A protein has these predicted regions:
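ER/Golgi luminal nucleotide-sugar-dependent glycosyltransferases, focusing on the catalytic module
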Residues: 1-262
């Protein structure tokens, strides 16, 4: 089995090195890394101290802003690099550089071999929800989330002001997409997923050939958690929802505001 790990990194190079070493299986895994354009690549690589050769640092780098379409751009760049490599992968994971596996490689391989056709990706229909908070994320226009300013405090103020203003401005979007004569509801998911190689190629081909995706998600809230879910919902492959047990391990401590999530 061939596995590709697509990793978005922006900080903590030593942890990224540990993550890649933990997931590496000789002859089975390749790694594609996008490093935020604001970070010095050579310095980061030196500190990561990755001693294996099956790691590709992609050259198409973007400045990533949380909640902006820039997240979709680096996701697309990683997918493109993986596909254009010419390697045929059975499975492709998308991870953050701050993740770490809680399963052994043997358990990961065993699960994937036992579920060869399962696409592991979250998706909750928010087009048909009655939750106004969720509807605002897709019906309101979210401008300036990728504004190229380095002052994070100022950027947060601008985003917050625009987001508040758009609640009251009577210019709204449909909470769904129409493409190829079909209505596609918007699904809220996660930036982390694991899909088959064929599924990844379908997603990529749809993204580069159909401009409707960028037109809609460019001004949506946290589009990186929705775009790929919605592309899959127009595919011919039937999707079914399954949730077995907990998806994370949480450890709450009295001294912490938020729990640690693994």
């Amino acid at each position: 089995m061939k596995i590709a790990y697509l990793i978005a990194a922006h900080t903590d190079p030593k942890h990224l090195g540990r993550l890649i070493e933990a997931l590496n299986i000789n002859g089975h895994t390749d790694f594609y890394v996008h490093l935020d354009k604001r970070v010095e690549l050579n310095v980061f690589q030196t500190e990561a101290n990755i001693r294996i050769s099956n790691v590709t640092w992609i050259s198409d780098r973007v400045i990533a802003k949380w909640g902006g379409y820039s997240q979709c751009r680096y996701q697309k760049a990683l997918i493109k690099s993986c596909i254009k490599s010419g390697n045929l992968y059975d499975r492709v994971f998308f991870l953050s550089g701050l993740d770490y596996p809680i399963w052994s490689n043997c358990k990961i391989l065993s699960y994937l071999k036992n579920h060869p056709d399962l696409e592991i990706i979250a998706g909750k229909n928010i087009s048909e929800t009655n939750d106004n908070l969720q509807l605002r994320k897709i019906k309101n226009y979210h401008f300036f989330r990728d504004l190229p300013i380095s002052n994070n405090k100022l950027h947060r103020i601008i985003k917050g002001f625009v987001q508040l203003a758009m609640r009251y401005i009577p210019i709204k979007r449909k909470g769904y997409i129409v493409t190829k004569g079909k209505k596609v509801n918007i699904y809220h998911g996660s930036s982390w997923w694991c899909v088959t190689g064929g599924c990844l190629r379908y997603i990529y081909n749809e993204l580069i050939s159909n401009p409707v995706w960028e037109q809609f998600f460019k001004f949506a809230y946290t589009p990186g958690k929705r775009l790929h879910d919605d592309v899959l919902h127009i595919s011919k492959k039937p999707l079914r929802g399954e949730l077995s047990g907990f998806l994370s391990i949480c450890q709450a401590e009295a001294s912490c505001i938020s729990p640690k999530v693994y």
